[in-house]
């Protein structure tokens, strides 16, 4: 639910209704289905109050398959696409960077002591909480391009850059706050915090570009700028940066 709601928010819209299609084995207990439905609605109530599940489809099969479709309202605004970034715009983020990747690393470590100690980071992976209401706020503030960070900051920056025929340059010093939030678990796991910030996905934070003259919503933090198209889509302090984010098609 969270990732689908974030997709609507990233268009600058307000999520309104959800349609759920499910395939479940014939042995599935009604109590499980009821609990699952309650969980879906609880997620809506928490992340996007007013959004409701209005229908869907249910079929039987060998394994559980779930498809979620979210519809939204632009409330008179234009949709914010990936293709509108302009040279001179600022690049800004609303929400954490690298926190979900940190949680995944903790889970993959299998170290139960660490998993318990850093429960907040683990929850970021298992139960993300994107800033859904800030999508409309960004649209109202004049966002020129936007998406949610689902596959890694660098990869998603690159998507805006390609769609807009520009290059996005990030200021490393503006990432220090995100890195600081990851310091303790990173030390425990022996991981470089910057790799999580740049390449970790599934935070579903909002990544947007705005005119330099725009008054950004308070929740957005400027991390860089849009420059003329160069040989590389994304730069970090003027240097090319490796893209090692998630590829949904390749599955890696």
Residue map of PLM features:
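Phosphate-handling active-site elements
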Residues: 76-81, 114, 167-169
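Glycine-/charge-enriched secondary-structure boundary and capping motifs
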Residues: 26-52, 59-66, 71, 140-141, ...
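Glycine-rich anion-binding loops of enzyme active sites
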Residues: 14-108
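Active-site cofactor/substrate anionic-group-binding motifs, chiefly glycine-
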Residues: 1-11
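A short, charged helix-loop
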Residues: 110-128, 183
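Glycine/charged-rich beta-loop-alpha catalytic/anionic-binding loops adjacent to active sites
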Residues: 73-74, 114-121, 188-191
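Internal active-site segments that recognize and position negatively charged phosphoryl groups
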Residues: 89-95, 127-153
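Glycine- and other small-residue-rich loops at beta-strand/loop junctions that grip anionic moieties
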Residues: 83, 94-96, 123-127, 146-149, ...
């Amino acid at each position: 639910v969270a990732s689908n709601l974030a997709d609507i928010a990233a268009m600058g819209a307000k999520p309104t209704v959800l349609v759920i299609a499910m395939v479940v084995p014939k042995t599935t207990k009604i109590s499980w289905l009821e609990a699952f439905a309650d969980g879906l609605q609880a997620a809506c109530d928490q992340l996007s109050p007013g959004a409701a599940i209005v229908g869907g489809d249910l079929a039987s099969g060998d394994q559980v398959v779930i498809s979620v479709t979210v519809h939204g309202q632009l409330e008179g605004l234009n949709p914010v696409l990936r293709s509108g970034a302009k040279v001179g715009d600022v690049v800004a983020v609303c929400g954490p960077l690298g926190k979900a990747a940190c949680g995944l690393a903790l889970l993959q470590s299998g170290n139960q002591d660490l998993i318990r100690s850093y429960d907040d980071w683990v929850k970021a992976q298992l139960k993300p909480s994107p800033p859904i209401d800030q999508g409309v706020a960004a649209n109202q503030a004049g966002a020129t391009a936007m998406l949610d960070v689902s596959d890694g900051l660098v990869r998603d920056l690159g998507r805006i850059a390609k769609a807009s025929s520009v290059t996005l340059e990030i200021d490393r010093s503006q990432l220090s706050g995100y890195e600081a939030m990851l310091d303790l678990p990173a030390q425990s796991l022996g991981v470089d915090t910057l790799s999580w910030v740049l390449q970790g996905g599934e935070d579903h934070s909002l990544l947007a570009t705005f005119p330099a003259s725009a008054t950004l919503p308070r929740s957005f933090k400027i991390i860089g700028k849009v420059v003329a198209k160069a040989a590389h889509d994304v730069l970090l302090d003027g240097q090319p940066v490796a893209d090692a984010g998630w590829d949904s098609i390749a599955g890696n």
